[in-house]
């Protein structure tokens, strides 16, 4: 009299958690949104521009031809890249009071992420400030140094409290 339905060799087609054996496959990461892809490409363009101040039109054209650009929100990408370059001085002046070092001492990735996040906080009022900050943090985690995302988070959180005071107050 043996019951083989739940032995280690025969788990009845289920995992230890009771899930069907077919559910044992690795979970795939959700596909990136078009806006996230546009932010990634804008960050890459700003990085190139910050390093060598090449013509932004040439950088933009190169990124339009980049693999995966067809999955990006082209309008948002163009607005981020061109807007951040056009308003670099104004955006930097907005977040600079919240830095604990000179702007020139920031890594190019941190600086580019701050420019993208600052531009969105100031100009993309349809995007909640928490989403703007989270997206900049994710960019920094993906492309930046080990702890850079914490710094970007802190700076943009303080900037959001200043430029979107009513929205921040309503959510806290």
From Swiss-Prot:
This is Transcription antitermination protein NusB. GO terms for biological process: DNA-templated transcription termination; transcription antitermination. Residues 1-37 are annotated as: Disordered. GO terms for molecular function: RNA binding. PANTHER family: ANTITERMINATION NUSB DOMAIN-CONTAINING PROTEIN, N UTILIZATION SUBSTANCE PROTEIN B-RELATED. HAMAP family: NusB (MF_00073). It comes from Cupriavidus necator (strain ATCC 17699 / DSM 428 / KCTC 22496 / NCIMB 10442 / H16 / Stanier 337). Pfam families: NusB (PF01029). Belongs to the NusB family. The gene is nusB. Keywords: RNA-binding, Transcription, Transcription antitermination, Transcription regulation. Involved in transcription antitermination. Required for transcription of ribosomal RNA (rRNA) genes. Binds specifically to the boxA antiterminator sequence of the ribosomal RNA (rrn) operons. GO terms for cellular component: cytosol.
